[in-house]
Curated annotation (Swiss-Prot):
CDD domains documented for this protein: IQCD, RING-H2_RNF32_rpt1, RING-H2_RNF32_rpt2
Identification of the protein by name: RING finger protein 32
A GO cellular-component term linked to this record: endosome
Name of the gene encoding the protein in the UniProt record: RNF32
Matching InterPro entries: IQ_motif_EF-hand-BS (IPR000048), RNF32 (IPR042862), Znf-RING_euk (IPR027370), Znf_RING (IPR001841), Znf_RING/FYVE/PHD (IPR013083)
Transmembrane in keyword set: no
Subcellular location: Cytoplasm
Swiss-Prot/TrEMBL keywords: Cytoplasm, Metal-binding, Repeat, Zinc, Zinc-finger
PANTHER family: RING FINGER PROTEIN 32 (PTHR14991:SF0)
Tissue: Highly expressed in testis, less abundant in ovary.
Domain IQ: 186-215
Length: 362
């Protein structure tokens, strides 16, 4: 009887151990406690399913202005642990068949893990999953001292359905949000901005120095003063008013004035003088008692009233509408050599007025 009892107790222990191991494997495969996954969704859904009547409150308008409390700004550089509370021990862990999970790390232990990560330079290097810089995106430190993007680790846990480190394959790691990558990225950006600003300041200072201080080399000095002279000439040219439209308007105005003057002159000198007017002009010329041509300074009529047949044309006189008398040949020569007069508008050699002429014979 004792042998049968001992044999049955061993079978019971084996059965309990087998059930405990199976239960532990099921719990391990279900991954109920992923560190980065949002474990509070179920609680939020439960709160949303509550009746809305509990949230409805009567609002009384008293006319008084309520003081709005500004929300407290949380420290963006604050580090915190993402892991929820550790799950209860499974039956296999309680029986000692499998070792219990490691306890949550303390602050000192997390500091050691962080120092080990800094020595490895994980925050300086890109994320091992997406191969991109950490920049200002959320960064997660694992208990194995490896660093990843929070979104990358969350996607890795979702698609692998396991809680193992992507690098060292450590199971059931703990996670903590850190900001070393963001801090290093800000330092890098500040360094770039400062370097760019210093470069701009130095280049501006050097350009001003080159504009004001001439070089010592002869060729460079010559180019320096040539450039200065070119700049001065350009400024002088730019200072002039080159309004072409105004110049064209002034030219058109001058042409209009000239046309009006010529039109008045044509109206004055263009009409034909009648015989009666010529007689009056001839009487006025006789009153002048002019005896010599003002062009050749020779007498207007031959001495003693003699006439030479060959030189008859040379003795012809021209009476002008201004009552001046000249030799016809002298007047023709003057008209041929006059510059600037436009026929038939010639100017009298004495009074400079436009004239019409009539040929008189001595």
């Amino acid at each position: 009887m004792l042998k049968n009892k001992g044999h049955s107790s061993k079978k019971d222990n084996l059965a309990v151990n087998a059930v405990a191991l199976q239960d532990h494997i099921l719990h391990d495969l279900q991954l109920r406690n992923l560190s980065v996954a949002d474990h509070s969704k179920t609680q939020v859904q439960k709160k949303e399913n509550k009746s809305l009547k509990r949230d409805t409150k009567a609002i009384i308008d008293t006319g008084l202005k309520k003081t709005t409390q500004c929300p407290k700004l949380e420290d963006s550089e604050k580090e915190y642990v993402l892991d929820p509370k550790p799950p209860p021990l499974t039956l296999a862990q309680k029986l000692g068949l499998i070792g219990p999970p490691p306890p949550p790390l303390s602050s000192d232990e997390w500091e050691k893990v962080k120092q080990r990560s800094l020595l490895q330079g994980d925050s300086v290097q890109p994320c091992p999953i997406c191969k991109e810089e950490f920049e200002l995106r959320p960064q997660v430190l694992l208990s194995c001292s490896h660093v990843f993007h929070k979104a990358c680790l969350q996607a890795f846990e979702k698609f692998t359905n396991k809680k193992t480190c992507p690098l060292c394959r450590k199971n059931q790691y703990q996670t903590r949000v850190i900001h070393d990558g963001a801090r290093l990225f800000r330092i890098k950006c500040v360094t770039r901005i400062q370097a760019y600003w210093r470069g701009c300041v130095v280049r501006k200072w050097y350009r001003n120095l080159r504009k004001t201080v001439p070089p010592t080399d002869a060729k460079l000095r010559k180019k320096f003063f040539e450039k200065k002279f070119t700049e001065i000439s350009h400024r002088i040219l730019c200072s002039y008013n080159t309004n072409i439209e105004e110049l064209f308007a002034e030219i058109d105005q001058c042409l209009a004035i000239n046309r009006s003057v010529l039109q008045q002159l044509e109206e004055k000198c263009g009409h034909e003088i009648t015989e009666e007017e010529w007689e009056k002009i001839q009487v006025q010329a006789l009153r002048r008692e002019t005896h010599e041509c003002s062009i050749c300074l020779a007498p207007l009529s031959a001495a003693g009233g003699q006439r030479v047949g060959a030189g008859r044309r040379s003795r012809e006189m021209a009476l002008l509408s201004c009552s001046h008398v000249f030799h016809h040949a002298c007047l023709l020569a003057l008209e041929e050599f006059s510059v600037g007069d436009r026929p038939p508008f010639h100017a009298c050699p004495l009074c400079r007025s436009c004239y019409q002429k009539k040929i008189l014979e001595c």
